[in-house]
Regions:
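Beta-strand-loop-alpha-helix segment that lines the small-molecule cofactor/substrate pocket
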Residues: 2, 69, 73-81, 85-132, ...
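Contiguous beta-strand/loop segments that form the cofactor/metal-binding neighborhood of enzyme cores
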Residues: 5, 166, 191-285, 317-332
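N-terminal Rossmann-like dinucleotide-binding module
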Residues: 1-53
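C-terminal helix-rich "cap/oligomerization" subdomain common to oxidoreductases
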Residues: 1-6, 11, 32, 74-76, ...
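Predominantly a Rossmann-like dinucleotide-binding segment in NAD(P)-dependent oxidoreductases
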Residues: 17, 131-231, 357
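Hydrophobic residues in well-ordered beta-strands that form the structural core
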Residues: 18, 61, 100, 125-127, ...
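Conserved SAM-binding strand-loop segment of SAM-dependent methyltransferases
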Residues: 56-63
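Active-site loop of classical SDR/Rossmann-like NAD(P)-dependent oxidoreductases
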Residues: 17, 308-320
Length: 363
């Protein structure tokens, strides 16, 4: 069992993702204290302190003031995508372990700065890809490790919404976010797929992005109407990735697409021995005794959580528990920064291919 020493955490960015994921998940852990909150809108930091902070927690408008507090061991970066890199670099250089919300950065140059800072500081860095922690994803990963699928040579990473455009914050702002659904939700599906395949060596990719529905006024959006004039990112994006070993990945992402079969943070993998997907729970398919078979394991029986203080059915809580456990026991986090760097490189390649109309080759 992990040592129950207290880990003091600072939160940088107290908006939607911090309130919806990071702070509630950390709050469940008995050995975590959130002692500092920072936001450029000070009222958000104060509200976060009131709900999740210790009685003597501090609030800041400038993240560098938070980083100057030597008692803080861990920092969670929950800001818009463009600021992920420089805040994370500063936090690592200040001697903090860092969990940065996905994506790692808006491009590979900025992500490389984060990798360099992690190596320079010797501190831990992880990226918030909580989809790996779902029971279905964990099951598929174990089957892959056990060799159930054989050589995985094709996969499809899917993050498709019919009409679920995030209308709050800066999601629609190209400059702040670096893109739309591809970098927002496609990044989860791609990370999940690469992780299950255990393949992080892309050779080249081709991609397309579309701005077909973002100017519509007849929207039917799940989260209220968006402003067409401010919707500067793509509404959908698609990519095809060829890996160095010849395996291929089809990546689909959309906030708005005229389709019914919507799925998010899901993957399908095909190997020489069997296939698997997360389309309806977990499904494993193959041939046995000269007949096709379909296995749908029951992952919902009552049982103990994988980590004390976390709900086994909640990937965000599982992610936070695994992360703090890694800090306390000096082990690797589930998501290694080098893995997240590859995700960023592929996303960047798809965007670049979409701009040029040509394949993008990785060095």
């Amino acid at each position: 069992m992990a040592e129950k020493r207290i880990v003091k955490v600072g939160i940088i960015g107290c908006g939607g993702i911090a309130n919806g994921k990071h702070m509630p998940s950390l709050h469940k852990l008995p050995n975590v204290e959130m002692v500092a909150f920072c936001d450029i809108v000070i009222e958000r930091a104060e509200a976060a302190k009131a709900k999740y902070g210790t009685p003597d927690a501090k609030v800041y408008e400038n993240y560098k003031d938070l980083l100057a507090d030597e008692s803080i061991e861990v920092v969670h970066v929950c800001t818009p995508n463009r600021s992920h890199s420089f805040i994370t670099v500063d936090a690592l250089d200040a001697g903090k372990h860092v969990m940065c919300e996905k994506p790692m950065a808006i491009n590979s140059v900025e992500a490389k700065k984060m990798l360099d800072a992690q190596k320079r500081s010797g501190k831990k860095l992880t990226i918030g890809y909580q989809s790996r922690q779902s029971m279905g994803a964990q099951y598929l990963k174990k089957e892959a490790v056990d060799g159930t699928f054989g050589d995985i040579y094709y996969a499809k990473a899917t993050a498709l919404r019919r009409r679920a455009v995030p209308t709050w914050g800066v999601f629609l702002n190209e400059y702040e976010q670096g893109g739309g659904p591809l970098i927002d939700i496609g990044t989860h599906s791609l990370d999940l797929t690469l992780w299950i395949m255990d393949n992080y060596k892309p050779k080249y990719c081709v991609g397309t992005t579309y701005h077909k529905l973002n100017k519509d006024t007849n929207q039917g959006n799940a989260w209220g109407n968006w402003d067409p004039e401010k919707f500067t990112v793509e509404d959908s994006a698609f990519g095809f990735v060829v890996m160095e070993n010849g395996a291929t990945i089809n990546l689909e992402s959309a906030w708005a697409l005229n389709m019914l079969d919507v799925r998010e943070a899901t993957t399908l993998i095909c190997g020489t021995k069997a296939g698997g997907d997360l389309y309806d729970g977990v499904r494993i398919n193959g041939i046995r005794n000269n007949a096709q078979y379909l296995l749908k394991p029951n992952l919902n029986p009552q049982g103990a959580a994988f980590y004390e203080g976390a709900n086994a059915g909640d990937p965000a809580s599982m992610e936070a528990a695994q992360w703090i456990n890694a800090v306390v026991n000096d082990t690797d986090p589930c998501v290694l920064p080098e893995q997240a760097f590859t995700v960023t490189r592929i996303l960047e390649g798809i965007y670049e291919s979409a701009k040029t109309g040509k394949p993008y080759y990785f060095d």
